Amino acid sequence: MDSIIPAGVKLDDLQVILAKNENETRDKVCKQINEARDEILPLRLQFNEFIQIMANIDQEGSKQADRMAKYLHIRDKILQLNDRFQTLSSHLEALQPLFSTVPEYLKTADNRDRSFQLLEPLSTYNKNGNAVCSTATVVSTNHSAAASTPTTTATPHANPITHAHSLSNPNSTATMQHNPLAGKRGPKSGSTMGTPTVHNSTAAAPIAAPKKPRKPRQTKKAKAQAQAQAQAQAQVYAQQSTVQTPITASMAAALPNPTPSMINSVSPTNVMGTPLTNMMSPMGNAYSMGAQNQGGQVSMSQFNGSGNGSNPNTNTNSNNTPLQSQLNLNNLTPANILNMSMNNDFQQQQQQQQQQQQPQPQYNMNMGMNNMNNGGKELDSLDLNNLELGGLNMDFL
């Protein structure tokens, strides 16, 4: 085979040699490949037979003669397997120059998606037990989706094994190195006896995976600061909740529960004179200012009629104080508006009763106010149930 295909031949030269077919070169190469292929099937059958014999080794007799016959039979099977392996190894060694052209063949445009990997670099040994090893190369190609060209790595054969009954496979020494107790263990039963341990003998240098960046450790000072911030936020939230809760409870306790009679007694004039409407509309401000001026005239007339500086309307002042305390623009509710309007109505009724009981010297000055009070009474007698409230803007109220 060396005369047909020299060692270190290139792919282009091999293609030229096979194309010319001088001295039947192509036929000889095909014959050598077929001979190596024909050795594979008998080797597999003989190896399966050996495994079956080793699996049934305990089922035969235990006499000395039976043991000797069993030993000789197993020895013959091992020697036959050894001869088969040596024959196949010789054929593969002869085809080694042809295998060396595989990496170049995979680099061509038509074969980039293919891969070839020689798992068992076999070689023969001489009668002294030393392996006769040629420069066999192991081809390993790894194809990736991103790479357009394959990556090939060629390394020389590993150190040969100097055991008489081994096939110079470097995997056996690797197995003994990784598992030093394998030779001390007893024989195993079942089909595991005689089964060789197949390892990937590719000598391609493994690519170390990049290490993940280590996360920065959080110092104790940073942890303490984070805990202090969390505690401060919790305290602020607790203080806000405690401040807002008593105000809401006191407001709810101070508000009276309106009854149907109280709601029916509310007049539109009293509602229009509330502080809320005075703030929102200029009409309400003018009305409230006129009411305040009239109230001042009434108080002056009462002061002149009584002849002393004492204020007879003590109930009015006492009623104005809770009204001002309950007035809070941030807590305006319909119940508060009704309560304020009812207090104003009650004060006007008390003022009218006191004016009727006491003499009024300034009749002309109070005539306008009496007319206004009489008009308020007429409006108070209106029935709100018969009013058209569909045109009112309830959102504004």
Curated annotation (Swiss-Prot):
Pfam families: Med3
Compositionally biased tracts (Low complexity): 147-165, 309-322
Stretches for region Disordered: 147-227, 288-327, 346-370
Modification N-acetylmethionine occurs at: 1
Localization: Nucleus
One term under GO cellular component: core mediator complex
Keywords: Acetylation, Activator, Nucleus, Transcription, Transcription regulation
Keyword Nucleus: yes
InterPro entries, A to Z: Med3
Subunit structure and binding partners: Component of the Mediator complex, which is composed of at least 21 subunits that form three structurally distinct submodules. The Mediator head module contains MED6, MED8, MED11, SRB4/MED17, SRB5/MED18, ROX3/MED19, SRB2/MED20 and SRB6/MED22, the middle module contains MED1, MED4, NUT1/MED5, MED7, CSE2/MED9, NUT2/MED10, SRB7/MED21 and SOH1/MED31, and the tail module contains MED2, PGD1/MED3, RGR1/MED14, GAL11/MED15 and SIN4/MED16. The head and the middle modules interact directly with RNA polymerase II, whereas the elongated tail module interacts with gene-specific regulatory proteins.
Protein name: Mediator of RNA polymerase II transcription subunit 3
Gene encoding the protein: PGD1
